[in-house]
């Protein structure tokens, strides 16, 4: 019998540390015999990676940003995410639609009703026999105060167009994530990212065991 596919997203502001934990989760799943696809947004396909480069480096308004993001997302869903789920794989994605509502919606102040329309159009018609919107099964939200995140990023490397935004922008983004989590508490799991990496890793593995993603008998290290 084919195992259930899982679509798990990792969300948080720049500097929250989410990306550093994705490979550890992938390794834990592979030890249990699961096939894992690790991907990211913006990006995940050749077309979407090209759009990512434009998004991070070229000036554009909030509507253009949103259209670019959702164009890449549609290609990513059709080419990578939906087929992997049909095969029963676990998809681990570094950011997804919640980031669009947080960055373009809350951060840029773009109309969230328009984002919701784009979400419905882009993420539907991907599952056989239904026009339902495809959402993650679980979203891991790495919650960190914007001031702390900014201090972590300072001097790390040349910032992209988003990382270079003032801390007030990231306060709005962080609130956008909090609003999304409050609206869908069954899907979101919050992690306190203002802790040492191993403590965050322990939180993460406990959540994955509790949600049934990982075998509860497996060690989380």
UniProtKB/Swiss-Prot annotation:
It catalyses: dTMP + ATP = dTDP + ADP. It is an enzyme of class 2 (transferase). The keyword Zinc-finger does not apply. The keyword Transmembrane does not apply. ATP binds at residues 12-19. GO terms for molecular function: ATP binding; dTMP kinase activity. It comes from the Bacteria. Its EC number is 2.7.4.9. GO terms for biological process: dTDP biosynthetic process; dTTP biosynthetic process; dUDP biosynthetic process. GO terms for cellular component: cytosol. CDD domains: TMPK. Keywords: ATP-binding, Kinase, Nucleotide biosynthesis, Nucleotide-binding, Transferase. Signal peptide: none annotated. HAMAP family: Thymidylate_kinase. Belongs to the thymidylate kinase family. Phosphorylation of dTMP to form dTDP in both de novo and salvage pathways of dTTP synthesis. This is Thymidylate kinase.
